[in-house]
Amino acid sequence: MSDIVSISSARPRLLVSVRGPDEALTALRAGADLIDAKDPERGALGALPPETVRAIVAGVGGRAVTSAVAGDGTGREIAAAIATIAATGVDFIKIAVGGADDAALAEAAAQAPGRVIGVLFAEDDVAEDGPARLAAAGFVGAMIDTRGKSGTTLTSLMAAPQLAAFVAGCRTHGLMSGLAGSLGLGDIPVLARLDPDYLGFRGGLCRASDRRQALDGARVAQAVEAMRAGPRADAA
């Protein structure tokens, strides 16, 4: 695991989803803050094989924070998947939480204490008490993402006040927060104003803006530059 894990930052940090060690190095060299392992061919929360996650973590070598998708199953299935991915040495493990009850959430978080992040989908009705429930269950963070990956963006599904309330709820309950969902470089100024811990990208930083194609190091570098510049005063 990385020695530089942090759940807070002066401004949003850049999460880049990668599908293998080569892309992880591309993202790392371009300045990404968090390297997120997932399979873009399998939707929003497609899990990679544990050996691939392990290779990504080894390649990053503690130079950035790492996360990996465990999947979007439920019950014993997801509990076992969390334990398996946790054993790779990745810093954080992401799972879909959907309509899971409090007992199921607590069971999931207990598989890797202090390392599980719950993912909520923008297409669903994201409950206001989501951050509070995840914190009570033992999760370390919460993210909003889009389930569909056909180009519909987070900002077209949820208004800025809704996203701001989610980020504020995470902060109130001590959770790391993240926003993702078919984001492009143009979304950074607006979403950065909401001050989440992370903004997550995949397709917008790939060749031809196609999440199934290879990660483009130049685009990652542009995203890093935009993140470091901070939100524009006119980006309301």
Swiss-Prot record:
<feature type="active site" description="Schiff-base intermediate with substrate">
    <location>
        <position position="38"/>
    </location>
</feature>
<comment type="similarity">
    <text>Belongs to the MfnB family.</text>
</comment>
<keyword id="KW-0704">Schiff base</keyword>
<dbReference type="Pfam" id="PF04476">
    <property type="entry name" value="4HFCP_synth"/>
</dbReference>
<dbReference type="InterPro" id="IPR007565">
    <property type="entry name" value="4HFCP_synth"/>
</dbReference>
<comment type="function">
    <text>Catalyzes the formation of 4-(hydroxymethyl)-2-furancarboxaldehyde phosphate (4-HFC-P) from two molecules of glyceraldehyde-3-P (GA-3-P).</text>
</comment>
<dbReference type="GO" id="GO:0016829">
    <property type="term" value="F:lyase activity"/>
</dbReference>
<keyword id="KW-0456">Lyase</keyword>
<feature type="active site" description="Proton acceptor">
    <location>
        <position position="94"/>
    </location>
</feature>
<protein>
    <recommendedName>
        <fullName>Putative (5-formylfuran-3-yl)methyl phosphate synthase</fullName>
        <ecNumber>4.2.3.153</ecNumber>
    </recommendedName>
</protein>
